């Protein structure tokens, strides 16, 4: 059975920590968004899914604590996903983990429509979408200790060195996420860009509320599928790195 990474009960090892300090010219939280503006056309199928399922599965952004039990209609572990692209991995994970609820942030309408289409096709009930910047959602809708897990899969790597400061996984955001995790909750990042993987490992290792669940990079958890894009990269010899940390008490 697919499940969230097991808590082994022992103190996880920590990867070597860097200084964890953001560049001097980076201002938080306003300078870092959870998304990059992209052009994209909403297809007919996506538009139909938005019309058919949007009112049921897309939540309004409202500053103030989210009532997750009311939003999902039950009390269950809550996982935040920051940026889900076209929703391929999101729908798979929600399907193999029906016991968990997934609050998914994505601003791009084609992606929202694509995930809604998958929700309808698969009869998923444990996903809710916020078409809003995840940083503002974290700041204004998610109280401390409200999350059981966080997924950040393949965020924009900002390849050029002068753009590295725009990367999402930076110390201030990680500190916010760590405080919003319950003790034992997890933060799972994945990237196919090794320099970003190294930065992720350094930043997460420097956060005192988090401890590495592995000795460095983690094995790919069974719940995270290989996407078509990822499979293509692997065929071309590209690597993929998973980083999995847990909130300490």
Swiss-Prot record:
EC number(s) on file: 2.1.1.33
Active site residues per record: 156
Entries under InterPro entries matching the protein: SAM-dependent_MTases_sf, tRNA_(Gua-N-7)_MeTrfase_Trmb, tRNA_methyltr_TrmB_bact
Annotated function: Catalyzes the formation of N(7)-methylguanine at position 46 (m7G46) in tRNA.
Pfam short name (any one): Methyltransf_4
Keywords: Methyltransferase, S-adenosyl-L-methionine, Transferase, tRNA processing
Annotated metabolic or biological route of this protein: tRNA modification; N(7)-methylguanine-tRNA biosynthesis
Protein's recorded name: tRNA (guanine-N(7)-)-methyltransferase
Catalytic reactions of this protein: guanosine(46) in tRNA + S-adenosyl-L-methionine = N(7)-methylguanosine(46) in tRNA + S-adenosyl-L-homocysteine
Superkingdom of origin: Bacteria
Organism: Paracidovorax citrulli (strain AAC00-1) (Acidovorax citrulli)
Protein residues bound to substrate: 160, 192, 227-230
Enzyme class of the recorded protein, top EC level: transferase
């Amino acid at each position: 059975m697919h499940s969230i990474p097991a808590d082994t009960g022992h103190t996880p090892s920590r990867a070597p920590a860097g200084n964890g300090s953001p560049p001097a010219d980076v201002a938080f939280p306003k300078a870092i968004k959870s998304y990059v503006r992209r052009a994209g056309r909403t297809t007919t199928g996506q538009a139909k899914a938005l019309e058919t399922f949007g009112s049921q599965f897309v939540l309004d952004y409202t500053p103030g604590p989210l009532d997750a039990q009311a939003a999902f209609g039950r009390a269950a572990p809550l996982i935040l996903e920051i940026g889900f692209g076209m929703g391929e991995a999101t729908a798979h994970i929600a399907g193999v983990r029906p016991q968990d609820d997934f609050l998914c942030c994505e601003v791009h309408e084609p992606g929202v429509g694509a995930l809604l289409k998958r929700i309808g096709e698969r009869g998923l009930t444990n996903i809710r979408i916020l078409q809003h910047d995840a940083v503002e959602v974290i700041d204004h809708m998610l109280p401390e200790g409200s999350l059981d897990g966080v997924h950040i899969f393949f965020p924009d790597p900002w390849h050029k060195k002068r753009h590295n400061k725009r990367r999402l996984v930076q110390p201030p955001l990680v500190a916010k996420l760590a405080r919003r995790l319950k003790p034992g909750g997890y933060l799972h990042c994945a990237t196919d860009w090794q320099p970003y993987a190294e930065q992720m490992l350094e930043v997460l290792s420097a956060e005192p509320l988090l401890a590495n669940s592995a000795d460095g990079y983690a094995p790919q958890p069974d719940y995270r599928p290989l996407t078509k894009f990822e499979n293509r990269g692997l065929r071309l010899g590209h690597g993929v790195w998973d980083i999995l940390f847990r909130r300490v008490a």
